[in-house]
C-alpha cells in the first residue's frame, strides 16, 4: 500500500502545494488556459477563484482588412462571462481587456461595462483597456470612481466623448493614454487629472488630431509626451512638482505657460513642422533651466539653433551636470559651445560623434570631467577633430561606451 502511494504521489504532487501557491501558478497562465483547469475537479474550480490577473484579447491572427468590421464574437463574450462567474466575488489585482466593438453596438458596450463593473467591485488595482470602438465609448461610472485603482491604461483610438464631472480616482498613481480622444481635450487636465489627487506618472502617446494643449497637475512627477500629429499650435505645462520630462513633438508657435520648477531630468525631441514657419521655444527652454540632466536630440538642436538666430537667449543652466547633445549639421557645434558657456557645473558631456565638427569652433570645457563619444572609429580625421575639440591641455576623461 505504501509503495503504491509513493508511485502515484509524484504524478499528483502539484495538488499537495498550498492553495495560495497554486493560485499564483494559475495567474501566470493565459486566462483561457487557467479557466480550462476548472473542469478537472471541484478543488480546481475553487482554486481558479484565487487567480488575481485576468487577460482577454479577442484578436484573430491574420485579420488584415477584415479588422475594420470585426467585433468580438459570442464565444469571446461567453469566455469572459464564464470566467467572472467562476470567480464570484474573490479579489482581483489586474484586468486586461482588448476587444473590438461596433459603432452604436449597445449590446457589446453593455458587456464591456458589466465586465469592468465586476472587477471594480472586487477591488481591482490595475486596468488595461484597449477598446477598438468605431463610435463613442463612454467609460463606466464604476471605473471613473474606483477607489482601489492604482494603474490605468486606455487606448487605442478610443473616442470617450465628454467626461462626467464626478471623476474620482483617489488611489490612481499611473495613467497611460494611447490615442484616446476626448470631446474637449481640456478635460484631460480639468476633469481626468483633476480627479486623480495622487497621480504621479502620465504617459501620453497621441497620433491623431486634437492633442491635449494643456497638461496641468500639482502632483505629477513623471511625464512622457509623444505627439505624432502636427496641427496644434501651442502647448502649456503647469506641473510644479514634475521631476522627469520626456517630450517628443513638433516645435510649436509657442508655449504660453511652462511651470516646471522642480524638473531634474529632461529629454527633448522637437522636430520642425512644415505648417509652423517660425516656432518659438523660448518659454520651453527657460522652463527647463533648472534641470540636472538634459538630452537634446539632433532635431531639437536644429530647432533651438534656429530660434537662437531669431532672438532666443539661452538661460544659465545652474544645475546642469550631464548633457547629451545630438548633432546632424556643422552649425550645431556653435550651439553646443554656447550651452557649455551657460552651464557652470557641467561634468558629463555625451555626443554621438565628431562628424562635421569645425576645427575653428572652440569648446569651453572648463568644468567638464568626462566626455562620452558614442561613435568613434579612430581614423586620422577623427583623432584630429578630437584633439581640436578637447584643446591642448585638457584633463578630461574620454570614454567610448559600447552601445
Curated annotation (Swiss-Prot):
The keyword Repeat applies. LRR repeats lie at residues 239-262, 288-312. It comes from the Eukaryota. Residues 11-59 form the F-box domain. Pfam families: F-box, LRR_At5g56370. SMART domains: FBOX (SM00256). Keywords: Leucine-rich repeat, Repeat. The keyword Repeat applies. This is F-box/LRR-repeat protein At1g06630. It comes from Arabidopsis thaliana.
